[in-house]
Regions:
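Glycine-enriched alpha-helix->loop->beta-strand junction motifs that scaffold or abut catalytic
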Residues: 1-3, 22-28, 43-49, 63-68, ...
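N-proximal accessory regions
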Residues: 73-87, 91-99
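Glycine-rich beta-strand-to-loop/alpha-helix junction loops that act as flexible
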Residues: 8-9, 97-100, 118-121
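Glycine-rich phosphate-binding active-site loops on the catalytic face of alpha/beta enzymes
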Residues: 31-37, 70-80, 114-130
Length: 130
């Protein structure tokens, strides 16, 4: 699938980010926000989706020019209710919830206009069980 857009996840430092980019990653995802990773991604023109769950983390992401963030773990930090609350002061931010997203709540998350995408291990688990 040459047209597939493949990235790297759970990237937590600059060295891992550079390794992922050298391996061909087209985007980077982190469980938290790393200024070092953000700067490397910006310099290489690669999207970076850091984990942000508090207003402070979201403001730090915005200061770095990042407007789409990973919301992880979504189930621990309040799920869709929290996303809706955070969207009030940050209407320009889109979220990618992961952690606790499953077939039972997938449509509810995707129906919210501030959700850019979702992630979850259930995609892989279901494919492996076939």
């Amino acid at each position: 699938f040459p047209e597939m857009n493949i990235g790297a996840g759970t990237v937590i430092n600059g060295a891992q980010c550079l390794d992922a980019l050298n391996a061909g990653a087209k985007f980077i995802v982190s469980p938290g926000l790393s200024t070092e990773v953000a700067e490397i991604c910006k310099a290489n023109g690669v999207p970076y989706y850091p984990g942000c769950v508090t207003p402070t983390e979201i403001m730090q992401a915005l200061d770095l020019g990042i407007t789409t963030v990973k919301f992880f773990p979504a189930n621990v930090y309040g799920g869709l209710k929290a996303l809706k609350a955070l969207s009030a002061p940050f209407p320009q931010v889109k979220f990618i919830p992961t952690g606790g997203v499953n077939r039972d709540n997938l449509e509810e998350f995707l129906a919210f206009d501030k959700v850019a995408a979702v992630g979850g291990s259930f995609f892989v688990e279901e494919a492996l069980n076939k």
